[in-house]
Curated annotation (Swiss-Prot):
This protein's name: Uncharacterized protein MJ0248
Organism domain of life: Archaea
Length: 194
């Protein structure tokens, strides 16, 4: 039978042999949370950490403390999962429960990628391009270099290398002059001017 202790004692004694430092489960959870934020790698947590926290949550009487513990618990888990997926490739300090979550996420991603492959797409009719009616003349361009975001006062443009997009002719002319983009395909002019 497993015994759960709500308060973890870490005692330091003063000269008169009286304890002066006690860490509660709440403080322990909070400390783990902030330490996890500070570190790039996953922290080593006790193997039964999540079970202990769940048991602790069942015994909390104070609503405010309950709310805070649930917050730290949820955010700590989200942070650890995020780190495991994106930052820490070794994943050596993951708990078994977290590993199960990671594997479930990875399986879903693999299934979604399989569904997106061309062999699963149904053939459709070949659409013929429709004429584009615009107020301004536009050019279809390919971005040759990454370029920081900019605005023309109406839209915010974020140009990444190898993007293909349509731009207002005035903007495309300036960017083409500086060799940031190159024109491809057709140019579309205002039909009223033609």
């Amino acid at each position: 039978m497993r015994v759960f202790i709500i308060i973890i004692y870490f005692r330091c004694f003063s000269k008169d042999h009286k304890p002066y430092f006690v860490i509660t489960m709440y403080e322990s959870l909070k400390n783990y949370f902030f330490e996890e934020i500070k570190n790039d790698k996953l922290l080593k947590l006790p193997d039964d950490f999540y079970d202990d926290i769940r048991e602790y949550i069942k015994n909390i009487k104070d609503d405010i403390e309950l709310e805070r513990v649930k917050y730290y618990f949820k955010e700590l888990r989200k942070l650890r999962i995020y780190k495991a997926l994106y930052l820490d490739n070794e994943r050596e300090n993951l708990l078994p429960e977290e590993l199960n979550i990671i594997h479930a996420i990875e399986n879903i991603v693999v299934e979604l990628k399989i569904e997106e492959t061309p062999e699963f797409k149904k053939p459709t009719e070949i659409d013929t391009p429709k004429p584009i009616y615009t107020i301004n003349d536009i050019d279809v361009v390919k971005v040759d270099k990454n370029f920081p975001p900019f605005t023309d006062g109406t839209f915010i443009y974020d140009l990444n290398k190898n993007d293909v997009l349509s731009l207002d002719r005035k903007i495309s002319h300036i960017l083409e002059k500086h060799r940031i983009i190159s024109r491809i395909g057709e140019s579309y002019e205002n039909p009223e001017e033609s």
